[in-house]
Amino acid sequence: MTTPIVHAWMPSSPCGDGCLPKNPPTVGRIVLALRIVLALAAFGLLPVLVVLGVPFPRVRRSLTRIGARTLLFAIGIDLTVLDARSERERSRTAAGALHVAGHISWTDVVVLTAVQPSTFVARADLIDWPVLGRLARAMKVLPIDRARLHQLPGVVDQVADRVRAGGSVVVFPEATTWCGRAYGSLRPALLQAAIDSETWVQPIRLRYLDRTGEQTTATCFVGDETIGASIGRIFRLRGLRAEVEFTAPEAPGGDRRDLARRCEVAIRRDGVELAERPRKDVYDPTVHEEMAEAERSPMPPTAAAA
């Protein structure tokens, strides 16, 4: 088999082991063993629940949500959902929508499924991963091979068809994982699906908090870490909470780059005008925390090149 050429637009992230917190709190052996047993049960049960509910969409969504929440409990991640949208804003995404979020870890899929079961666009090799691959196949993940640009239009068409038919599809336009403290620009390609289907876009702020309520990078899946090592490390962590916040939906408009900028402004807390002028792909707010408020630009400066 020919190895695909890595193109100039291949998504990349500078995040690595150095982004992980030093000596985070962990659970003991007994709790870890219980987590593993419960997680294996949840991993085995969730695909079954999805299949059982196939003829009945509402039942399928409810069972999928229950399975995902059980899995989150097994992993040891609590869940908080924030939603200040008006009834009118909620109604705009009730019958099909494209959901947009930043990408931190494989746990993002579990967290967002626990809130609202959806179809996910994810890296193609996820289907072949141990354990998670089975879950991905059951949830009918739309695979995308980031090394093969010619496949992108087909994926966009599939997403547009799903939301046009009333489904909810989640995309991670950063196109790769970041640590959550630093993050990348939202790439506009997949957002074309919202424009083609004339569907509203739902931005979602997703972050992970430690037991003190501060944002943590403990769950990030970055650098050279394998999926097995990441699962083992995250299962040992204690005091984690995922926070999911729904912001006001964005109209699709006619320009996917403008839509990407609007969504980026919506899902980032660090600066109202974050996406309003050209910048490099990575921003780390901790680099600039020592700046005086009076001197700080409403658009955070760039910390490093991607």
What are these regions (language model features)?
Residues 18-81, 134-139:
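A transmembrane-helix-recognition feature enriched in membrane-embedded lipid enzymes
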Residues 93-104, 108-115:
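Glycine-rich active-site/cofactor-binding loop and its immediate structural neighborhood
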Residues 95-101, 141, 167-173:
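Generic beta-sheet signal
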Residues 143-145, 247-253, 265-269, 306:
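Polar-ligand-bearing catalytic/cofactor-coordination segments
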Residues 159-169, 175-191:
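Soluble extracytoplasmic domains of inner/organellar membrane proteins
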